[in-house]
Amino acid sequence: MKRVITILGAVSAAAALLASCGGNSPATAVDSTGHKCYSGIYPHLAYYNSQGECGTGAVVPWQNDLWVITYSPHMPFGSDDKLYQITPDLTETARPESIGGTPANRMIHLPSNQLFIGPYAIDADKNVRVLEWEKVPGRHTGMAAHLTDPENRILLATMEAGFYDIDVHTLEAVELYKDGNQKRKEGFKGELCTLFPGYHGKGFYSGQGVAVFSNNGEESELAQRQFDIPSGCLAEWDGKDWKVVRRNQFTEITGPGGIYGNPNPGTDPIWALGWDYRSVILAIREAGKGWSYYRLPKASFAYDGAHGWNTEWPRIRNVGNEGETELLMTMHGMFWHFPETFTTANSAGIRPRGAYLKVIGDFTNWNGRLVFGCDDSAQSEFLNKRKQKGRIGGPGQSNSNLWFGTPETPDNVGPVTAAGSVWLRDNVKAGEPSDAFLFNGWDNRCAWVANRSANDTEITFEIDKAGNGQWSEFRKVSVPAGSSLFVPFEPTDDAVWIRAVSSADIVSDLTFVLAEQETRDTEPDPMFKGIATLKENADSKGFMYGLPNQRRALGILASTADGEQYYELDGEMNMRAKTDDETADYIRDKFAIPHGVVEVDEGSVLIVDAKGRRWRLPLGADGYAEKIAGDEVRICREVATERDLLSLCGTFYELPAENADGYAKVRPVCSHNYVINDYASYRGMMMFTGIDHSAAKGNPHIVFSEDGKAAVWAGAIDDLWKMGKPTGHGGPLVDTEVKAGVPSDPFLIGFYDRRDMYLSHSGSGSVTFKVEVDPSGDGQWFTYGEYEVAAGQTVEHRFPRAFQARWIRVTTSEDTKATALFEYR
């Protein structure tokens, strides 16, 4: 495609300079660009602002350079955020024309040969013009081809439903609808968005005679606490009137033309990405047909939240090399392959590629490398507070960075295990099919179906084998009143989409859980060599804090053989001892590891969340309970904006904010035998303290202080997938006094590989153990099986590969002392 060539330019000597960081020599982090690089992150490219968040709004190659904009969380009238120009030798310049704000819009306007990015228009000679905030106030979120004069004009949308008609030559703007922030500035007391439901705008695109806009939030106090209320909107405008298309949270809107706009706007489809508390929603608008909908599973639930703040900007974007089309989609923590030919008649080809932990606002292919613009370190932490973090706060100054990878990076991150529902506490009508749910792309698949009604039903699963809209009967299952059922699928069951039909009116839950075969083992990647283990004491430890007030360094209060010493790590990764008692005292006070915020017993780690809910996580290697009790290891910290990283008993977990359902949706990432004293994000990197200096020699990921007495590990958060597959053991009951019919606490079982269960009791007669699962963490329990356990007997059960669920619990038929243990190998 010519348009791909226009944006990428020729791949020349610049491509050689931008070789992978994997080309580092064994003892240095300097790569072939001459810059230090840690797992694809160049510290010198990091950007800062003075607000509570510094996210990446857009990254676009233009005239051989990479153009990047950052945003503050709510600055509709400008800020100190910048437009950055990065040359192929990785020289970064903050353009003097920068006016900041909260921008994430970008479009290449081919007729005028300009890049529009944020409030800037950049011509073929790299001259930058500015759309002043006085003329176009608001948080710029999207641009779309003009409905009647696409050669000379462009449409701009703001997050608070402001819309402008802009002359691409003069940049004169006609206000179509006033931005909500501007209305409030002028004295308006109502909601920010009044044109349609929801607020917190995201996507904007045009075609088929309409402009389509999305928002993904709700402006209410309840939306800041409860994730499953009505929220968001997909709407379209015909040039005169607005029409609500669907009342759900939506983000990206695009089409085959991507950043350029559709080449055949009258007939090309429009795609939109959204979600609700059930699953991801994929919408498509086709000429002459209107809107159709499909559902996909969520790899991560950390993006949920009715306020819409946790998503940033998911995208569908061409990342193919010159002359190629390869669409990459990001949504709810998953990289997806998206087919450029996607229509309702040809819907095959969506495929999960890999799960990730970074928070990504935009991405592109630049000279053969994928570049992800991230939202890494937010000073405010917003609503993401919890007891297990203690008094720790965010960094002193918000900062983020770019993450460079290869075209294969999306395939080489985390496993694509995911879950989603088509029905969740829903009133289901007899004979009415559910939405289509993606079925192909995973090795191990199952469904959990529940009939919460007083009448029996038969559920018919139907499949669309080829993605052509032709449905056929696949399987029937009977679900009596008040019962639930585990429905495993075989790896050979082949279809693009699956849906369900009930024979009776019922209240039902139907959740699919899908997983690929685990290919990782328990051995960590050599990049982690030198982090202290349970068998080796650390030569240096320390607490870390990103410094405020434009110091742009990482403060480290280190513990060494010589005692306590304060260090600073700068943007060139030089670590020097400093005398700064004020900062050292601040770190000592605010960043101490909290005591007693979790309970480790002989079977599990017990966590009680902010809502009083009880959760149990597996144990790891012997020795971690002592480390936790002694406050030697950080338990919980935000290292990617608006979600936490939990570290317990040798396992790292992704932990959504409480407003995204928190511990209910926790996800294990990796297991290990390391004793990591502290972890933090800095300039886009993942940082660890707790280093065995002798073992660390020669590892380019280890940064030593100039005096050689302290050290830290530096990499990327998605390196954690290489630390070792999740393992663990334990259970919710260990010779525990139980009452008949009272369920145990939930115990995590999701995301592990080989899983075994052991049931026993101390009673003199037989006891029946009822085993239930919550497949997605949504609080709906399904019966997996009932096991009669004789006195003195231990019943062992290995879960089949098709079995997938997040939580498990057991209930006994008698009062007794019961044991329910699990081994995850």
Segments from the language model and where they lie:
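A short helix->beta-strand "capping" segment at the edge of beta-propeller domains
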Residues: A29-G52, M527-N537
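Beta-strand-rich domains and repeat architectures in extracellular enzymes and scaffolds
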Residues: L45-D81, G100-M107, R445, N537-T560
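Repeated scaffold domains used in trafficking and secretory/extracellular systems
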Residues: Q51-A58, S98-S112, K135-N152, N181-Q208, ...
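Beta-propeller domains
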Residues: W67-G100, G118-E132, I166-D167, Y177, ...
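Beta-propeller blade signature
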Residues: D81-P88, L171, Q224-K240, L282-G288, ...
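Loop/turn-rich, solvent-exposed surfaces of beta-rich toroidal or solenoidal domains
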Residues: I270-A272, V280, L296-T343, F437-N440, ...
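Blade-level signature of beta-propeller repeat domains, shared across WD40, Kelch, NHL, RCC1
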Residues: K358, D362-R425, D678-E737, L748
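Noncatalytic modules at the cell exterior or secretory-pathway interfaces
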Residues: P491-S508, P800-T816
